[in-house]
């Protein structure tokens, strides 16, 4: 399935039905009083979060969403039926914004969470409502109230406990494949991962947690370089970031400069993301060149007081120690504090 995490919608609630102008007409009562019924209210437009969806793909081709209008009132004091509410289902983690102003209208973070975003218009009153002692036969009724309209921007931010980040081809997909049932595409070239991938990690006696493999980040990502800032937002909800660093290319490559560049990108994207706790995983420890530079790399990160764990997703070396560190940090604070 194609991963879609942003979509624009044109939304409207239902108009209210019009009130009816009608008079009682029966045999021997040619000039009966008014009996026009009220119009029904228009349907509300409601958003509901559901775990059954993982992408906004279904809405990409349904960009106009409108609730049903209320039925018009009728004679014999019959009221129009209310318009049916329209429930738009979205994945858990969907942020709803006003397209024009960018104002956040809703943040749906729980399964089953609902919000009435646009209220349906009220139904108009029929002429029976307007009869008075001085006007016993009103020949007018109220029109239905118009529904609300709004252009919305929906953004999906993945609800992951752990966000994996690093340069393209740093070993993120290999790690999530090793520790979960997720099976992202893996190959020896940059940008193998073109969409976020989620994996559930069940580990020892800890509660299971969700890990997200985010497409590789390069310098300028906050401005859209590489796969762009559209994926940085998925790290914002993570409780902890695991930054994977490949030192097997030393001395030709400079993983330390890359590490600092990626962290600058996080800080430029959002201050909160730049300050989020990180654990470093030194990947590809099954390669001799990575082993050669291990002591140097550990010293570099330890000087900066950054927890560092050498791992190999190929052999499993060090993976258990990394998962221990992740789990201990995750359950040290409740999720609402992340």
UniProtKB/Swiss-Prot annotation:
Binding residue positions for Mg(2+): 173, 193
Top-rank lineage group of the source organism: Bacteria
Compartment annotation: Cytoplasm
UniProt GO MF annotations: GTP binding; GTPase activity; magnesium ion binding
Binding, GTP: 166-173, 191-195, 213-216, 283-286, 312-314
EC number: 3.6.5.-
Domain OBG-type G: 160-331
Cofactor entry: Mg(2+)
GO terms under biological process: ribosome biogenesis
A family per Pfam: GTP1_OBG
Keyword hit for Nucleotide-binding: yes
UniProt domain Obg: residue ranges: 1-159
A single cellular component GO annotation: cytoplasm
Disulphide connectivity of cysteines: none
Keywords: Cytoplasm, GTP-binding, Hydrolase, Magnesium, Metal-binding, Nucleotide-binding
Subunit (UniProt): Monomer.
Similarity comment text for this entry: Belongs to the TRAFAC class OBG-HflX-like GTPase superfamily. OBG GTPase family.
PANTHER family hit by this protein: DEVELOPMENTALLY REGULATED GTP-BINDING PROTEIN-RELATED, MITOCHONDRIAL RIBOSOME-ASSOCIATED GTPASE 2
Function: An essential GTPase which binds GTP, GDP and possibly (p)ppGpp with moderate affinity, with high nucleotide exchange rates and a fairly low GTP hydrolysis rate. Plays a role in control of the cell cycle, stress response, ribosome biogenesis and in those bacteria that undergo differentiation, in morphogenesis control.
Protein name: GTPase Obg
Gene behind the chain: obg
């Amino acid at each position: 399935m194609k991963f879609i995490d942003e979509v624009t919608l044109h939304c409207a609630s239902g108009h209210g039905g019009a009130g009816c102008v009608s008079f009682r007409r029966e045999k021997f009562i040619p000039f009966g009083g008014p009996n026009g019924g009220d119009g029904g209210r228009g349907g509300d437009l409601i958003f509901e979060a559901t775990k059954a969806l993982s992408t906004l793909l279904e809405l990409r081709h349904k960009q106009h969403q409108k609730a049903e209008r209320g039925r018009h009132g009728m004679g014999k004091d019959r009221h129009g039926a209310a318009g049916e509410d329209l429930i738009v289902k979205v994945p858990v983690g969907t942020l709803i914004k006003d397209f024009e102003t960018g104002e956040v209208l809703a943040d749906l973070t729980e399964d089953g969470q609902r919000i009435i975003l646009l209220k349906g218009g009220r139904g108009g009153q029929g002429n029976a409502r307007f009869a008075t002692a001085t006007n016993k036969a009103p020949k007018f009724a109220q029109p239905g109230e118009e529904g609300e309209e709004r252009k919305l921007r929906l953004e999906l931010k993945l609800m992951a406990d752990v966000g994996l980040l690093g340069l393209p081809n740093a070993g993120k997909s290999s790690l999530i494949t090793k520790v979960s049932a997720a099976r992202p595409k893996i190959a020896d070239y940059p940008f193998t991962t073109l969409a976020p991938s989620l994996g559930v990690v069940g580990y020892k006696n800890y509660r299971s947690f969700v890990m997200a493999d985010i497409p590789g980040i390069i310098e300028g990502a906050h401005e859209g370089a590489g796969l762009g800032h559209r994926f940085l937002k998925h790290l914002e909800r993570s409780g902890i970031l695991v930054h994977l660093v490949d030192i097997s290319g030393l001395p030709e490559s400079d993983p330390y400069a890359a590490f600092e560049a990626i962290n600058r990108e996080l800080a430029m994207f959002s201050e909160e993301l730049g300050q989020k706790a990180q654990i470093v995983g030194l990947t590809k420890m099954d390669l001799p060149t990575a082993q050669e530079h291990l002591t140097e790399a550990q010293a570099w990160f330890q000087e900066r007081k950054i927890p560092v764990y050498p791992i190999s997703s190929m052999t499993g070396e060090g993976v258990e120690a990394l998962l221990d560190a992740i789990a201990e940090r995750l359950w040290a604070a409740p999720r609402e504090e992340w």
